[in-house]
Amino acid sequence: MEIRGLITRLLGPCHLRHLILCSLGLYSILVQSVHCRHHDIGSSVAHQLGSKYSQSSSLSSSSQSSSSLAEEATLNKDSDAFFTPYIGHGDSVRIVDAELGTLEREHIHSTTTRRRGLTRRESSSDATDSDPLVITTDKGKIRGTTLEAPSGKKVDAWMGIPYAQPPLGPLRFRHPRPAERWTGVLNATKPPNSCVQIVDTVFGDFPGATMWNPNTPLSEDCLYINVVVPRPRPKNAAVMLWIFGGGFYSGTATLDVYDHRTLASEENVIVVSLQYRVASLGFLFLGTPEAPGNAGLFDQNLALRWVRDNIHRFGGDPSRVTLFGESAGAVSVSLHLLSALSRDLFQRAILQSGSPTAPWALVSREEATLRALRLAEAVNCPHDATKLSDAVECLRTKDPNELVDNEWGTLGICEFPFVPVVDGAFLDETPQRSLASGRFKKTDILTGSNTEEGYYFIIYYLTELLRKEEGVTVTREEFLQAVRELNPYVNGAARQAIVFEYTDWIEPDNPNSNRDALDKMVGDYHFTCNVNEFAQRYAEEGNNVFMYLYTHRSKGNPWPRWTGVMHGDEINYVFGEPLNSALGYQDDEKDFSRKIMRYWSNFAKTGNPNPSTPSVDLPEWPKHTAHGRHYLELGLNTTFVGRGPRLRQCAFWKKYLPQLVAATSNLQVTPAPSVPCESSSTSYRSTLLLIVTLLLVTRFKI
């Protein structure tokens, strides 16, 4: 079902602008039982939330705001694209999970749906071990292909290597099972399917949005891994394993913007990526063996085990594996740092715009169960909380597209519907508790965020206010209204404190400042402050931490100029896209991309982004310590080193505001006026006095 149709059916125009900032509502800060959860947030799918679901959300205090990431993008049919589609696999599966000690046998019948024209990927068995493109993995032989990077350099690529059995039929919603052995030589020359998900159609064929849509066929048969190796074949090369983002409801490893060829060939590293289940198919939780939750994270974990056991066959060093990901991908990386099941499967981590403490990263078990039952009800399945097996049995029979089309009605407002949960298996406790107790992998991390993290999502939610065009501004009245819509669960004192913190008091009526304040409000709450928190905790434990603030806006960026440097804008440069001369990047942007790739690959090789000897081309990147808190600004022609970033605003969200809410929970505070009086600054004097007084009460216990 198209998102446009859902918007028309579910939403009246007056509801569209209520969808954004509710996820910014402080509800998840104030009520710790739920942690909301990419290019990981704000996506078209948030528009599917109708007023009837908003009303139903009041039935449960655990139902919270739904902020959806638009991390889905373009269907690129270009024959030169790095990834092109294929499908394959047999019909019966033998479940033998040596890692978990599980033995059983089930069968997927031949009626399993396949896409027309795509066949099983087996080649003739005439390949010999002398063929450098034929690799013998622990499950069987695979044949790769040689590709040319845009720079003209060659790489060898193996795409669509099965690391798990297809999660079809009775395996839907379950943890993955290792792939079975095969005979002959398996063709690994075409990229894998993308896992079933909704597709962003909100802005039509606008490239700034469609670049995140899956570009290979959608299928439940999607658990495959890709390996790209520089030529000549290295020995014991560092491995960089990419985990894509998309709010846990979308995304695919095959996007053009993730093209592995340039990074691998320019930096002499092996680049690996994996597909994992998203949306309800990957994260539905009912607390039963049939629907244990976190299936998508277990997919990732199984892929990490495959890399550990096989990457040496491709010239990689299994003792130098670095995970890197963005948005929900960065959250995934961070959860592997926390999980006892994953900690020993890799060495280092790069987290781009994501942290496990983000309000959208996890939900409680109770909320996850409620959402699963709402989905069951939406697709006419049994939804009795005392008969969960009946719900799962029915949900397994439904078309996967029907599930993902209906899951956005399974929650109140402004949350990604199916995200990780503390399941007692992959995660034993909340990320906050793990960080506080020091129960996480002690290692080197590189992390950071972008200057305008919030705009991408606001454009999808406040569609009437922030239109996708130049010259958009926000009046003071519109700003105050947006803050109210953004924070529906907090009292008047807290809401006025937010207004005060994000007002430009030099020019409080400046329409550009008011617009930009909304971006900072969203970006600080959902991204920057959580990234800061994670980096700080790692630094306090004595780990090597390197932090960045990404500030470069591509000259060819299709979004309006006022959107600045948005969520995900660094990805092109990490993978070396500017080096593709056909895409029109300027020479200084090509050099900048080379610098970013070198920083990232240096870190993967040594745990330090700096070169072994000082270089004028690579400014020194200082460590982010618990006291210094330094970060490097990543932009054209800049070597600026700052502290933070945004320490004051993050102290506001993480320290001051929770205390203010606690101190004023029983007070009635007059809300700020919709239209400021003669002077915007004078209208808040009484409120400011109250806030300061309450802070003193909280701080000094007077």
Swiss-Prot record:
The keyword Endoplasmic reticulum does not apply. Residues 1-36 form the signal peptide. The active site is at residues 327, 453, 567. Its main location: other. Keywords: Cell membrane, Disulfide bond, Glycoprotein, Hydrolase, Membrane, Neurotransmitter degradation, Secreted, Serine esterase, Signal, Synapse. Residues 107-134 are annotated as: Disordered. It is a peripheral membrane protein. It catalyses: acetylcholine + H2O = choline + acetate + H(+). It comes from the Eukaryota. Glycans are attached at residues 187, 637. One of its GO terms (molecular function) is acetylcholinesterase activity. Rapidly hydrolyzes choline released into the synapse. PANTHER family: ACETYLCHOLINESTERASE (PTHR43918), ACETYLCHOLINESTERASE 1 (PTHR43918:SF12). This is Acetylcholinesterase. The lineage of its organism: Eukaryota, Metazoa, Ecdysozoa, Arthropoda, Hexapoda.
